[in-house]
Amino acid sequence: MTNEEELVVLADEEGNAIGTAPKATVHTTDTPLHFAFSSYILNPRGELLVTRRALSKKTWPGVWTNSMCGHPAPDETNADAIRRRGVSELGLDFGSFLDIQVVLDDYRYRAEDSSGIVEWEICPVHLVRLAVGEFVEPLPDEVEEFAWEEPQKVFDAVDATPFVFSPWMVDQLSHPELRQAILEAFDPEA
């Protein structure tokens, strides 16, 4: 499915779905509130996948961010959307996902990038665990580069240089419960 075909589910302030719009037309200087998801993907050792957004991205090109974000299609659960985007964006197999857990169910944010494009999303944050032996092969149109890092190193980098990371990642990681969930999954002995 291309951006031109992909639909985004629009929302009202109370979090109710109120319609859809083509993804290609939604992100502007006057972006309507819509549903999205954000995910932090961990390998079996608990290392965190961080990605650098492709330079061709409309918003925040070249910025380091969490593992993967996206938009659920109409009538699609966030878990199914995460699997779909994991396949299409990161080159994972549909069966790669051991566990998908919601950590910040009510997360929402509004941010404006330097070009004036606005992100305004109701965006539950998920922790995703991958099966042993899974490899990431990101699409170049989505991901410029990626790294698997110890979670505390990522937290330290975000705290020291927040301007290098997406505003939603910085904001999400300001929630102690997300950091704790990620740290609890880290097992360097695995």
Swiss-Prot record:
Its EC number is 5.3.3.2. It catalyses: isopentenyl diphosphate = dimethylallyl diphosphate. GO terms for cellular component: cytoplasm. Mg(2+) binds at C69, E89. InterPro entries: Idi_bact, IsopentenylPP_isomerase_typ1, NUDIX_hydrolase-like_dom_sf, NUDIX_hydrolase_dom. This is Isopentenyl-diphosphate Delta-isomerase. The keyword Protein biosynthesis does not apply. Its cofactor is Mg(2+); Mn(2+). One of its GO terms (molecular function) is isopentenyl-diphosphate delta-isomerase activity.
